[in-house]
Each structure stands twice: as structure tokens, then as C-alpha cells.
Amino acid sequence: MVGGGPGAFIGAVHNRAATLDGLAVLVAGAFSSDPAKSREQGEAYGLASNRVYSTFEEMAIGEAALPPGERIDFVSIVTPNHLHFPSAKAFIERGFHVICDKPLTTTLEDAEELCRLVKKHDVVFALTHTYAGYPMVKQARALVAAGALGTVRKIVVEYSQGWLATPLEQTGQKQAGWRTDPARAGAGAIGDFGTHAEHLAKYVTGLEMERLFADVSTMVPGRRIDDDANMLVHYQGGAKGILFCSQISVGEENRLSIRVYGTSASLEWHQEDPNFLYVRHPDGPTEVYKPGHAHLVPAAQRGTRMPAGHPEGLLESFANIYSSAMRVIRARIAGETPDPLDLDFPTVRDGASGVHFIQTALRSGRDGTWVDASYDPPGR
């Protein structure tokens, strides 16, 4: 693991997700830019002292020098955004598989270079767009693909939080500090979780953006980065979309939801109540899909661990991304063909699309105009 030192929220989440299904064990890390903190975190995880590194560069070199049976099989990158690119590059160039937090990078140039490096070195690269791991999101994706909604006409995705409704970064709070720092975050609400909204819309509907118009704001006085954005989107095939993301919605915790309206039916899913997927018809009762039932598509069944009526949540969704990627990595190491179901995870090309979306939305917000949002990342 690179990142995830003392006091970091996301590092522990990544570790629990990676180990939930017994497919991986943490054996090495460069957990902090402060060597003392990296050692402290390594001790907390019970790692051998010679596998705890001071920098990601030292770790990439050190692990590559070990025999194949001893070195890491893949690396989790859970640093602030500005370190995703150099960390991933260092490991990819040495042939290591990578699972990286989002957004992929802070610039499109870096994102595209990672796409080319992944293809050149033929490594597995997974991006943790966590919400794509929920079983009911996979069910929604399958329903849209099967034509259960008819032709998609409208997509509405909301992602609202309220934790930055005040200048929390001025109090010394660690997460608020780096997430509102343009040098480390790259972008604010759009980069932090607007990319989740963009990816969720694309993942569920299969539709790519063509044009967008963004109203991007900084609501908290003195803040150096956007904290609220509202976007109108034109998708391929004529569908229209509304995406909005906000960090200043007082009282909201993690309100991510998606509604998709087709010519014959619609669906709705809420991340804060993730075990229910609603499908509505104009002339019949509402259908409610729930995990743990045999009528669900294989991808939704694969992502469910408990019997019906036993709620699962964010950690399990996170683990679904990890476990799929890890099974593909294991198949690659064994020289086997992976199960097609395991290929259902966000990739480096999804990451590049997310970075392109961020920059396109910010440009539209700055210029006050509709902009071309179509994009085909390299590395196909």
C-alpha cells in the first residue's frame, strides 16, 4: 500500500476491502511521506520492518528486487490525488499490477500516460469507483442493457454532502485540508466525488457524454476550490442528463442517487439505502429488487455475500471491486483466462474518462458555455 498512514480514513477502508474475501494480505507499504509515521503504520499492521518503506520510489525499487514469490503481487494507491500519477507510474514501469483510488490523476496528460503505460507493460489496473460494486447497481446496469426501460431519455444523478458547508479546512482538519488544496486535490467537488456521479451514470446506462454545460461555484468564502457544481449533459443517442455534486448541502451526509427514465420504464437507486432498486412502470406496480435472490443477474449475485434480508453496504461494495480485480490478477499470474464476471471493474481508461470529465466541466464553468465532452481514452 502507498498512502494510508496514521489518521488517514481511506487507507483502512482499502485494506479491509482487499482482505474481506481472504484473497489478499497486506505485506508491504510506504504509508506516509514522513518516515516515522510510515514505520508507525507498518507496526500497527504487524509488517516486517524491512517491508516498510520511506517513499513510494524506495518501495517500487525494493519490491522489484525481491524474488517473484516474495515481492508484492499488486499495490494499492490511496494517497492524496496529486501523488496517484507518480506512484502508479513507478510500479507499472516495474511490472506491478495496481489498484488505485479515484480520481486517477490531476491532469489529463498524466491520465493518458498511465493508459499507455498500462497497455505497454500489460498490467491489471483497477480504479476504485466504489459504487459500481453495489449488487443493485449491477442489477440496474443489466436491466438497462436488456432494454427493460426501453430507450433511455433522461438521467439524473445527485451527489450531495454537507461536511464542507463551513471553512473546515481552516481548523487544521486533515481531510478538509488536502481536499480543498488545489495543488493536492486538483479539483474540488467535481474531482472529489463528481467523478463518482459521472461514472455511475455511464456504468448504469452505458451512454457516453457528448456535450455538457456546468455551473461551477465556490460557496464558502475564502475557499480556493469549487465546492458546488450543477451540470446539464447531452448523451449519445439523444438522452439528456442532470448531474449535480455539492459539498455545502447542509445536513446531507453521502446522498448519492441515480434515476434513469426510459421510454417504457424508469429506475431509481440510493446509495444511503443501497439494498433496494426500484423499477417503475406507467401501468403497473413498482418492482423492488433486493440482494440475495436467485432471479438477480449473475453479476449482482456474485457481489452478494449474505442471505436475503441481511444488509450489506459500502465496505462490501468496495470489496467487490477489489475481489474482481484480484481474481483477474491471480488468473494472470497463473496463466489462466479470467472469469468474464471478474472483468467487471473500473479500469485506467475509466479513470482517464473521469479526469477528462473534470477538466471539461471546469472549463465549461469558467467559460460559461456548452463544451464538447466526447472522449476516447488511449490504450484500448
Language model features with spans:
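N-terminal Rossmann-like dinucleotide-binding module
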Residues: 1-47, 326
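Beta-loop-alpha module in the N-terminal Rossmann-like domain of NAD(P)-dependent dehydrogenases
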Residues: 51-117
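C-terminal glycine/acidic-rich active-site capping loop/insertion
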Residues: 230, 235, 264-345, 380
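Glycine-rich, aromatic-lined ligand/substrate-binding cores of catalytic
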Residues: 193-275
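A short helix->loop->beta-strand "cap" motif at the edges of active sites that frequently abuts
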Residues: 94-96, 121-123, 239
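Hydrophobic residues in well-ordered beta-strands that form the structural core
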Residues: 100, 106, 125-127, 269
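Predominantly a Rossmann-like dinucleotide-binding segment in NAD(P)-dependent oxidoreductases
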Residues: 124, 131-223, 277, 368
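C-terminal helix-rich "cap/oligomerization" subdomain common to oxidoreductases
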Residues: 66, 324-380
